UniProtKB/Swiss-Prot annotation:
A Pfam match: Arginosuc_synth
Quaternary structure, from the entry: Homotetramer.
Upper taxonomic lineage: Bacteria, Bacillati, Actinomycetota, Actinomycetes, Acidothermales
Top class in the EC scheme: ligase
Organism: Acidothermus cellulolyticus (strain ATCC 43068 / DSM 8971 / 11B)
Gene name, Swiss-Prot/TrEMBL: argG
Principal location listed in the UniProt entry: cytoplasm
Family: Belongs to the argininosuccinate synthase family. Type 1 subfamily.
The protein's name in its UniProt record: Argininosuccinate synthase
EC number: 6.3.4.5
């Protein structure tokens, strides 16, 4: 029986070339699997392209709702920002793609899964560790990395085989897009002194262009967005609408030199209007509803959660344990946040929650204040006791010298 290989297919140059390369080098049949995570492309065109490039079968899986509910929402509840800024656009989609690749391999009785990642990027790790976590027995092929395939060689291969790919050596950028955002790299951006130019952006309008502000109210239940301006929405609908509205205001542009998993620093430009607006709102609702010590510790958990996902460890035991912690921490994160979207910023202007720990009667300095200030003196004395005790010791030691 001819060996079968399932290929993670994007429709681009590298994965299109991978189809012919795998067939030539291994004699295997290639089944192309394209997962729709909201990249905004015509998936039927991509499916037909895979067949035209030599795949014996090609599948398109609409995973947009699944991506929103099971991957973007957990990232939102974790306020997931790698290095404090990057909302894990590409990193979030890879474990979902891994899941569908492994399922396809089982359906088609394939013995291997292939991807088109290079040896310099993070995605090779995310694909291979994720696939190995779901089925350790599947072999993994990485033709672009393992054959040292350059862009020039890939173009030459495509031209020699007559592959239906429109590409030129002048195409300057590498772009990865999904529902949660869009990543742009390479080209002139590799000189970190060069400022991004307006033409690279697609999800966000120029924030410097004057336009009326947009006010939006986002409602959450247990940390999950459930309504916008009072209208019930699914996670997919919430992200889609805020991508549109925040994007129209230029919200969510990020220019970052980040620490890649493989040990190099890389300049990346991102646009994630919906993600940035939602995380801004969610963080503020946590400020209102989460107790201080839990909030402090959760910030540490959030950071580690983002690092694990960035590093391709979505299916790891630690990630699962952190998920359980975050789930508990979100039990009271219910309420409404009002945002003003304008000039590239999402600014919180209002908060309300039936679970709020903010008590006006305790916080006010006006008439009606219920805070008993007579208790403060003893609290301050006890709070400062360790510091005063240490100071006396240090002063005595100094005097002894």
């Amino acid at each position: 029986m001819t060996e079968r290989v399932v290929l993670a297919y994007s429709g681009g140059l590298d994965t299109s070339v991978c189809i012919g390369w795998i067939t030539e080098q291994t004699g295997a049949e290639v089944i192309a699997v394209a997962v729709d995570v909201g990249q905004g492309e015509d998936m039927e065109v991509i499916r037909k392209r895979a067949l035209a490039c030599g795949a014996v079968e090609a599948e398109v899986i609409d995973a947009r709702a699944e991506f929103a509910a099971d991957y973007c929402v957990p990232a939102l509840r974790a306020n997931a920002l790698y290095m404090g800024r990057y909302p894990l656009i590409s990193a979030l989609s890879r474990p979902l793609i891994d899941k569908h690749l492994v399922a396809a391999a089982h359906r088609h009785k394939a013995t291997a899964v292939a991807h088109g990642s290079t040896g310099k990027g993070n995605d090779q790790v995310r694909f291979e560790v994720g696939i190995g976590s779901l089925d350790p027995e599947l072999r993994i092929l990485a033709p672009v990395r393992d054959s040292g395939m350059t862009r020039d060689r890939a173009i030459a291969f495509a031209e020699a085989k007559g592959l239906p790919i429109e590409v030129t050596k002048k195409s300057p950028y590498s772009i990865d897009a999904n529902l949660w955002g869009r990543a742009i790299e390479t080209g002139f951006l590799e000189d970190i002194w060069n400022a991004p130019i307006e033409e690279i952006y697609a999800y966000t309008a120029d924030p410097a262009v004057p336009r009326p502000a947009d006010e939006v109210v986002v409602s959450f239940s247990d940390g999950v967005p459930v309504a916008i301006d009072g209208r019930p929405v699914s996670p997919l609908e919430a992200i889609t609408e805020l991508n549109r509205r925040a994007g129209a205001q230029g919200v969510g542009r990020i220019d970052l030199v980040e620490d890649r998993l493989v040990g190099i620093k890389s300049r990346e430009v991102y646009e994630a209007p919906g993600a940035v607006a939602l995380i801004t709102a969610h963080q503020e609702l946590e400020n209102v509803t989460v107790e201080r010590d839990l909030a402090r510790f959760k910030r540490l958990v959030d950071q580690r959660w983002a690092e694990l996902v960035y590093d391709g460890l979505w299916f790891s035991p630690l990630k699962r344990a952190l998920d359980a912690f975050i789930d508990t921490a979100q039990r009271h994160v219910t309420g409404d946040i009002r945002l003003v979207l304008h000039g590239g910023r999402a600014v919180v202007t209002g908060r309300r929650s039936p679970q709020a720990l903010y008590d006006y009667r305790l916080a006010t300095y006006d008439t009606g204040d219920l805070f008993d200030q007579s208790l403060a003196k003893g609290f301050v004395e006890l709070w400062g006791l360790p510091s005063r005790t240490a100071a006396r010791r240090d002063l005595a030691a100094g005097a002894g010298e």
